[in-house]
Amino acid sequence: METQSEEQAVTKPADSGGEGGPPQVAGAQAARPEDRMTLLLRLRAQTKQQLLEYKSMVDANEEKTPEQIMQEKQIEAKIEELENEVEEAKTAFEMKKLALDRMQLSTALKKHLEKVDIKTSVLMDNMKQILNLNKLIMKSQQETWDLEEKLLDVRKKRLQLKQASERKLLEIQTEKNKQKDDLDSMENSDKIKAIQQNLETEIQITTVIQHVFQNLILGSKVNWAEDPALKETVLQLEKNLTMI
């Protein structure tokens, strides 16, 4: 419903104003923004439909893969970009339409005054001043549109950088998952199991030797706490090798 109302709003023809050439010029100049807005609205509707279909497919799965999350973020960012372009196009269209209406009104009034009374110099001067002001307004609006286009380019570049960073994060996550899988496969291999068994055997033997040395030192009744070297040796013997 929202898309249909917006399409009706943007495709409504501008008021013709008066008779003669200016209304036709307004219609010709307003046609291109209308076509652009209609295209943007159609693209936004198609993208939304694709997102809904994609979400329904994802909901059928138990969990999302990093690739699916990445694609979903890209689609949402594209929808936001299209919505911004639609709003900017609508604003630009309205501003152009208002400026053209002002110029048409000023031109029609000027011609009317020329026909009614050629001596109305004060009004003619005012009308010329109004026309000059309209030209200045159009120039300022053009500069504003140029700045908006530059801002849009900056936003697009920022979006591209964001997508590139997300792709890099996805690559890092994929590499981490691969390393984890490789490590799991190594832990399950017979070679790793044999190494672990040998290590446990060596730890047990070393622990027995530690206990023997501790008993020898304690049995000798030497005050090992006063001898720094002997104290360090005793403290080393108290370490639990299974925690290393």
UniProtKB/Swiss-Prot annotation:
There is a cross-link at residue 64 (Glycyl lysine isopeptide (Lys-Gly) (interchain with G-Cter in SUMO2)). The modification Phosphothreonine is found at residue 65. Residues 1-33 are annotated as: Disordered. This is Centromere protein H. It comes from the Eukaryota. Residues 66-104, 146-189 form a coiled coil. Pfam families: CENP-H. It is found in: Nucleus; Chromosome, Centromere, Kinetochore. GO terms for molecular function: kinetochore binding. It comes from Bos taurus (Bovine). Self-associates. Component of the CENPA-NAC complex, at least composed of CENPA, CENPC, CENPH, CENPM, CENPN, CENPT and CENPU. The CENPA-NAC complex interacts with the CENPA-CAD complex, composed of CENPI, CENPK, CENPL, CENPO, CENPP, CENPQ, CENPR and CENPS. Interacts with KIF2C and NDC80. One of its GO terms (biological process) is mitotic spindle organization. The gene is CENPH. PANTHER family: CENTROMERE PROTEIN H. GO terms for cellular component: kinetochore; nucleus. Belongs to the CENP-H/MCM16 family.
